Amino acid sequence: MPSGAFRCRSGHKAVVMANTPLFLGQNSSLPASPDEAVLDYVANPRPGALYMIRFAAPEFTSLCPVTGQPDFAHLVIDYAPGECIVESKALKLFLGSFRNHAGFHEDVTVGIGQRLFDEMKPQWLRIGGYWYPRGGIPIDVFWQSGPPPAGLWLPDQGVAPYRGRG
């Protein structure tokens, strides 16, 4: 293994990753699709510690697969890291790649959670997709990899249920 590198599991294979992130500090264009997006991972700075990382994307967008109209969501991703953590700029580019992707709310939300879990191999991961109403009905989608580790502090995701103007 090269000096300054670490091993992090990604998908079905072990990947040797440099300690230098792929995108951080670099000019990076938005991937054309989620399939083209590369998620980058760095070594967990606190291996062995039980803690949670939260990412919130309050202005997430994708496209309705039927009408082609934009759909908007507030995503909250929580995870207890294992050997590696997702690099935040890579995650931002991955999430941004959905703005021209057509998918149902359920597929988009669960797909994001499963890809992160499958590649990063955290101890635990959950995602909440709080979708804004289209056709008068808000849709909230929740997925988690399994029960959270005992002793992990799990704050509420902090997104109020949709109440409209009433």
UniProtKB/Swiss-Prot annotation:
Residues annotated as catalytic: 64 (thioimide intermediate), 71 (proton donor)
EC id: 1.7.1.13
Cross-referenced Gene3D superfamilies: 3.30.1130.10
GO cellular component terms attached to this protein's record: cytoplasm
NADP listed as a keyword: yes
Claim: Thylakoid is one of the keywords in the record: no
Compartments, as annotated in UniProt: Cytoplasm
Biological-process GO terms, alphabetical: queuosine biosynthetic process; tRNA modification
Function field: Catalyzes the NADPH-dependent reduction of 7-cyano-7-deazaguanine (preQ0) to 7-aminomethyl-7-deazaguanine (preQ1).
UniProt family annotation: Belongs to the GTP cyclohydrolase I family. QueF type 1 subfamily.
Official protein name in the record: NADPH-dependent 7-cyano-7-deazaguanine reductase
Biological source species: Novosphingobium aromaticivorans (strain ATCC 700278 / DSM 12444 / CCUG 56034 / CIP 105152 / NBRC 16084 / F199)
Source species taxonomy: Bacteria, Pseudomonadati, Pseudomonadota, Alphaproteobacteria, Sphingomonadales
Gene that produces this protein: queF
